[in-house]
Amino acid sequence: MYDNLKSLGITQPEEIDRYSLRQEANNDILKIYFRKDKGEFFAKSVKFKYPRQRKTILSDNDSQGMREISEISPNLRYVIEELDRLCLRDRQEEDLKRKILDDLRHLESVVANKIAEIEADLEKLTGK
């Protein structure tokens, strides 16, 4: 699992927090950020440079004939797919944690209201 990330030397992909991708001249620059340890001000990161793949294609405009384009490297595409899977899983886990905490807070409120209602009923019975 995560063979492409491991081929980059990333031995613990589960420690990845996020990534950024930008284009500089004829290269794509991938920067991977890892989770911060307690007491650290900055997250550790690694940077990779991928040359853009050049292709010559037939132009839509008949007068130009052929034209050259550049696109993302296939290897980088595979790495990004793995990063997206990792980051999406982390976001889903965070969303689930948030939902569970929200449900727990709601349950606390419902139970507190029910206890107050029962105590009020009990007070009515003992007050007579």
From Swiss-Prot:
Q: Which InterPro entries match?
A: UPF0325 (IPR020911)
UniProt cross-references to Pfam families, sorted A to Z: DUF3461
The UniProt family comment states:
Belongs to the UPF0325 family.
What protein name applies here?
A: UPF0325 protein NT01EI_0832
- Which source organism does the UniProt entry give? Edwardsiella ictaluri (strain 93-146)
